[in-house]
Regions:
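Structural microenvironment flanking redox-active thiols in thiol-disulfide oxidoreductases
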Residues: 65-102, 113-119
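Thiol/disulfide oxidoreductase modules built on the thioredoxin-like
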Residues: 101-105, 113-156
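C-terminal motif of bacterial Sec signal peptides marking the signal peptidase cleavage site
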Residues: 12-14
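Hydrophobic beta-strand anchors of alpha/beta hydrolase catalytic cores
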Residues: 52-53, 83, 129
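Short active-site neighborhood of thiol/selenol oxidoreductases, capturing the structured segment around
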Residues: 43-64
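N-terminal "domain-start" segment that seeds a small globular fold
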Residues: 16-44
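Sec-dependent signal peptide recognition
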Residues: 2-8
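Short, conserved active-site loop motifs that form the nucleotide-linked donor/cofactor pocket
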Residues: 81, 107-108
């Protein structure tokens, strides 16, 4: 019984850890195939040096939980145009209802229609947040970001936003 509990505790601990995935590059062609959630217009973020991309869905309770932290990040100096939320396996209509209900801050809401960017970025599920520098995923937060994660992002990555 103790071994089962220890195994379960280790599994839960591993699953809740932030994971660094170095070497995953997002193809430029994938980043220029995204559409805005509100108008459906094509948007090209392939030239951005620094991005914070959050994968989310309107039906995801943890996405609702972390949303205020992402809004706060989007209002932080240097991050104003760097925070993107990609709707993952969700309808545009539900995404717009989510924004209407929970607010938007300075976040850029996008649709990954075929989940192509999510798949090639190694997304496990929602919510998941990636810190991207020059197309490379340099940090992954799997699960909802917390206040501590928000502070870590601001403290560790604000110098990259220049």
């Amino acid at each position: 019984m103790k071994i089962k509990l220890l195994t379960l505790a280790l599994f839960i601990s591993f699953c809740s850890q932030n994971i660094v995935d170095e070497g995953i590059f997002i193809e430029t062609s994938d980043l220029n195939s995204l559409k805005t959630l509100d108008t459906g217009e094509n948007i090209d973020i392939s030239e951005a040096d620094f991005l914070v991309i959050n994968y989310w869905a309107s039906w995801c309770l943890e996405c609702i939980e972390e949303h205020p932290y992402l809004i706060e990040l989007s209002k932080t100096k240097g991050f104003e145009n760097a925070v993107y939320m990609l709707s993952f396996q969700d309808s545009r209509e539900n995404g717009l209802k989510f924004i209407s209900e929970y607010g938007s801050g300075n976040i850029n809401y996008l649709v990954d229609e075929n989940s192509k960017v999510a798949i090639y970025s190694g997304v496990f599920g929602v919510p998941e947040t990636h810190i991207i520098k020059n197309g490379e995923v340099i940090k992954k937060y799997i699960g909802p970001i917390s206040l501590n994660d928000l502070q870590e992002i601001i403290n560790n990555y604000s110098h990259l936003t220049n």
